[in-house]
């Protein structure tokens, strides 16, 4: 039976590391098992990175993710963003050329837009990578396009791959929890794990809706990250997988 494993938790709680360890467990325990890692935010990272003219990896670097910095937005970058829009089928819900000016005026102007005089440069934007990701994911995608846009894209991706184990690293919104536990159309068993840091000093606080949590009724398990070394975390994750995941996969 195929299994959908969702990970929930505050920013900085270690969800990505836990996801990697679950995939490692799958490879170690069931070498022929097809296990894949997924993220609701993958198209968000791709869109935000081309808009800002950087790589998705740059936006994901924790050391600079919270720091406001200057980015130059160019016409060619917006054209590439439109290509990403088409790549993920977002144009089936809203046209990029219609939605972008609304988003730009309502949400980017407050982030200190300064007009550029350089050729092809439209303006400079002073913003942190995390804030840009939040705006693209929630205000642009969920509010201006469709509340379920990132869920729809992820469901299509999982259905296409047809993995034995799909690990979703970033379950943040109530309808994402609902997708895993109540309304998924993928014919997969599901677990939703809350990754909890033993000490709150490791997490990153935010009042953005994407960090407000999901209803407890969707959470099936809790895994405590003590931040006491990768080997200890591996033991915790492997023990969890032996007890909870193996009966569903085996």
Swiss-Prot record:
<keyword id="KW-0067">ATP-binding</keyword>
<keyword id="KW-0235">DNA replication</keyword>
<dbReference type="Pfam" id="PF21448">
    <property type="entry name" value="DNMK"/>
</dbReference>
<dbReference type="InterPro" id="IPR048444">
    <property type="entry name" value="DNMK"/>
</dbReference>
<feature type="binding site">
    <location>
        <position position="210"/>
    </location>
    <ligand>
        <name>dGMP</name>
    </ligand>
</feature>
<feature type="binding site">
    <location>
        <position position="150"/>
    </location>
    <ligand>
        <name>dGMP</name>
    </ligand>
</feature>
<keyword id="KW-0244">Early protein</keyword>
<feature type="binding site">
    <location>
        <position position="17"/>
    </location>
    <ligand>
        <name>ATP</name>
    </ligand>
</feature>
<dbReference type="InterPro" id="IPR027417">
    <property type="entry name" value="P-loop_NTPase"/>
</dbReference>
<protein>
    <recommendedName>
        <fullName>Deoxynucleoside-5'-monophosphate kinase</fullName>
        <ecNumber>2.7.4.13</ecNumber>
    </recommendedName>
</protein>
<feature type="binding site">
    <location>
        <position position="16"/>
    </location>
    <ligand>
        <name>ATP</name>
    </ligand>
</feature>
<comment type="subunit">
    <text>Monomer.</text>
</comment>
<feature type="binding site">
    <location>
        <position position="65"/>
    </location>
    <ligand>
        <name>dGMP</name>
    </ligand>
</feature>
<comment type="function">
    <text>Allows the synthesis of deoxyribonucleoside triphosphates necessary for the rapid viral DNA replication. Phosphorylates all four dNMPs. The enzyme had the highest activity with dAMP and had about 30% less activity with dTMP and dGMP, respectively. The lowest activity was observed with dCMP as the substrate (about 35% of that with dAMP).</text>
</comment>
<dbReference type="GO" id="GO:0047507">
    <property type="term" value="F:deoxynucleoside-phosphate kinase activity, ATP as phosphate donor"/>
</dbReference>
<dbReference type="GO" id="GO:0006260">
    <property type="term" value="P:DNA replication"/>
</dbReference>
<feature type="binding site">
    <location>
        <position position="170"/>
    </location>
    <ligand>
        <name>dGMP</name>
    </ligand>
</feature>
<dbReference type="GO" id="GO:0039693">
    <property type="term" value="P:viral DNA genome replication"/>
</dbReference>
<feature type="binding site">
    <location>
        <position position="138"/>
    </location>
    <ligand>
        <name>dGMP</name>
    </ligand>
</feature>
<feature type="binding site">
    <location>
        <position position="176"/>
    </location>
    <ligand>
        <name>dGMP</name>
    </ligand>
</feature>
<keyword id="KW-0808">Transferase</keyword>
<keyword id="KW-0547">Nucleotide-binding</keyword>
<keyword id="KW-1194">Viral DNA replication</keyword>
<comment type="similarity">
    <text>Belongs to the dNMP kinase family.</text>
</comment>
<feature type="binding site">
    <location>
        <position position="44"/>
    </location>
    <ligand>
        <name>dGMP</name>
    </ligand>
</feature>
<feature type="binding site">
    <location>
        <position position="130"/>
    </location>
    <ligand>
        <name>dGMP</name>
    </ligand>
</feature>
<feature type="binding site">
    <location>
        <position position="172"/>
    </location>
    <ligand>
        <name>dGMP</name>
    </ligand>
</feature>
<keyword id="KW-0418">Kinase</keyword>
<feature type="binding site">
    <location>
        <position position="14"/>
    </location>
    <ligand>
        <name>ATP</name>
    </ligand>
</feature>
<feature type="binding site">
    <location>
        <position position="137"/>
    </location>
    <ligand>
        <name>dGMP</name>
    </ligand>
</feature>
């Amino acid at each position: 039976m195929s299994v959908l494993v969702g990970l929930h938790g505050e920013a900085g709680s270690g969800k990505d590391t836990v996801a990697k360890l679950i995939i490692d467990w799958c490879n170690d325990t069931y070498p022929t098992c097809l296990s894949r890692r997924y993220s609701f935010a993958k198209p968000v990272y791709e869109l935000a990175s081309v808009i800002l003219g950087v790589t998705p990896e740059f936006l994901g670097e924790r050391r600079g993710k919270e720091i406001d910095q200057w980015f130059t937005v160019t016409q060619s970058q917006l054209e590439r963003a439109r290509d990403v829009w088409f790549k993920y089928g977002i144009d089936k819900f809203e046209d990029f050329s219609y939605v972008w000016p609304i988003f730009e005026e309502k949400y980017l102007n407050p982030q200190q837009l300064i007009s550029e005089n350089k050729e092809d440069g439209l303006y400079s934007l002073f913003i942190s990578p995390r804030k840009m990701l939040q705006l693209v994911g929630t205000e642009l995608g969920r509010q201006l396009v469709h509340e379920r846009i990132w869920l729809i894209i992820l469901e299509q991706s999982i259905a296409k791959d047809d993995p034995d184990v799909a690990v979703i690293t970033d379950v943040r919104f109530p309808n994402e929890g609902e997708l895993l536990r109540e309304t998924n159309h993928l014919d997969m068993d599901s677990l939703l794990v809350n990754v909890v840091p033993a000490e709150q000093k490791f997490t990153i606080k935010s009042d953005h809706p994407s960090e407000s949590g999901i209803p407890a009724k969707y959470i099936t398990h809790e895994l405590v990250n003590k931040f006491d070394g990768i080997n200890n975390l591996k033991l915790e994750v492997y023990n969890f997988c032996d007890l909870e995941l193996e009966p569903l996969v085996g």
